[in-house]
Amino acid sequence: MTTYATDSQGKFIPSTQRPDGTWRKPRRVRDGYVPQEEVPLYESKGKLFAQKPLLPPGMSPEMAQKSREKREREQRIKQQREADANRRPPQNPVPGLLILNGDSKINQPQQRAAKSAKPKKKAVELPDVLLEQKQKEEQKQVRQQQQQQKSQKDHKNTKPHHQERIEEVAKAMNGLQLTNNHVASASAADALQTDLSKKLRKLRKKIREIEIIEERLRSTDGGPRPDKDQIDKAKRKPEILKEIEELEKGIAK
């Protein structure tokens, strides 16, 4: 355990001598610092519970042993009384008549009468119940057959009407499909005309740019000369004029 000394500035660890004879410097201790070896070890709840005494405070092991033996003895006596009560012979049906535990001949007629009485009651009630269930099932089957026959007749009567409705719907769908095809073809033609017009405008714009380049080539006022890309663009003038002519024919159609 670390020993501390105290001065006017607080606690500190005094200097100690090493095994080689040299001395360590004294070290100042911060307030509230606890060395690692003095930190209490963590113990789980199970370990703490196991360390607690099993007996109540002030109770000796001998007293606990006597109390446990007394409780076990009382429990055995209680079980013995219950077993004796279960083995107790039945009450005498006739006053003055003694019935022993091993003699069961006297009780046999009564037991046979009780056993035979119960099945007779069931034999009387069971057929009636089965008969009622069978009648209910037959009535249910008859009702189901009648409902099936009625539904089949209704289906036969309504079949022509449904057929007419189906044919009307099919005709309407065919007419709608033709209308949609016509609208689609018209919209496609309009889109094609729009694309041709846009392309024609772009080509005409290129022709105007080429004409400007040609004017710069013909001019002698000493202005800036066209570069190589502009000259190559001017050489494509015949091709562009041919494309414009073809597009104009396509738009005219």
Swiss-Prot record:
Subunit structure: Interacts (via N-terminus) with mago and tsu/Y14; the interaction is direct.
Region (Disordered): 1-168, 218-237
SUPFAM superfamilies xrefs: Pym (Within the bgcn gene intron protein, WIBG), N-terminal domain
InterPro entries: PYM1, WIBG_mago-bd, WIBG_N_sf
Protein name: Partner of Y14 and mago
Species this chain originates from: Aedes aegypti
Gene: Pym
Coiled-coil region list: 129-156, 189-221
Subcellular location: Cytoplasm; Nucleus
Residue ranges, compositional bias (Basic and acidic residues): 65-87, 131-141, 151-168
GO cellular component, one term: exon-exon junction complex
Family membership noted in the UniProt record: Belongs to the pym family.
Transmembrane segments: none
Listed GO biological process terms: exon-exon junction complex disassembly; nuclear-transcribed mRNA catabolic process, nonsense-mediated decay
Stretches with biased composition (Polar residues): 1-19
Primary localization class, coarse: cytoplasm
Known function: Regulator of the exon junction complex (EJC), a multiprotein complex that associates immediately upstream of the exon-exon junction on mRNAs and serves as a positional landmarks for the intron exon structure of genes and directs post-transcriptional processes in the cytoplasm such as mRNA export, nonsense-mediated mRNA decay (NMD) or translation.
Keyword Cytoplasm: yes
GO molecular function, one term: RNA binding
Protein keywords: Coiled coil, Cytoplasm, Nucleus
